[in-house]
Amino acid sequence: MARYTYLVALVLLAICCQWGYCGAMAMPDEERYVRKEYNRDLLDWFNNVGVGQFSPGQVATLCRYPLILENSLGPSVPIRKRNSELINSLLSLPKNMNDAGK
């Protein structure tokens, strides 16, 4: 019986250590700086690898906005949202709520 008590105590200690480790991880505010560095590295990689494939302006637009490919024959179109649309989508508000507030 004492073995099971020690085993349960060891498992609880491991769970507490895991929670402490998760608390020390990067907060969401810090993650955006990591993403900026990742985007810079990705842009540099595109510039170095695709020397003959992309022009410098084309590579910058590839990293800035997500692209929509409506069909394979047409050019890709960037998605752009206004700030109010972004805020409403984050708050899960319908579009008519925004019009009612004006």
Curated annotation (Swiss-Prot):
Residues 1-24 form the signal peptide. One of its GO terms (biological process) is entrainment of circadian clock by photoperiod. Predominantly expressed in adult head. Expressed at higher level in males than in females. In adult brain, it is specifically expressed in the ventral lateral neurons (LNvs) as well as in 2-4 tritocerebral cells and 4-6 abdominal cells. Keywords: Amidation, Biological rhythms, Cleavage on pair of basic residues, Secreted, Signal. Its main location: secreted. The modification Alanine amide is found at residue 100. Disruption phenotype: Increases total sleep time, decreases sleep latency, leads to loss of morning activity peak, and a failure to wake up in advance of light-on anticipation. In a CCHa1 mutant background, diminished morning activity and phase-advanced evening activity compared to single mutant. No significant effect on free-running period but reduced power and rhythmicity of free-running activity, which is further reduced in a CCHa1 mutant background. No effect on photic entrainment of circadian rhythms. Pfam families: Pigment_DH. InterPro entries: Pigment_DH. It is found in: Secreted. One of its GO terms (cellular component) is neuron projection. GO terms for molecular function: neuropeptide hormone activity; signaling receptor binding. Neuropeptide PDF is the main transmitter regulating circadian locomotor rhythms. Required to maintain behavioral rhythms under constant conditions by coordinating pacemaker interactions in the circadian system. Together with CCHa1, involved in regulating intensity and periodicity of daytime activity, possibly by modulating rhythmic expression of circadian protein PER/period in a subset of clock neurons, but not TIM/timeless. Acts on small and large ventral lateral neurons to control sleep and regulates the state transition from sleep to wake. Belongs to the arthropod PDH family. This is Protein PDF. It comes from Drosophila melanogaster (Fruit fly).
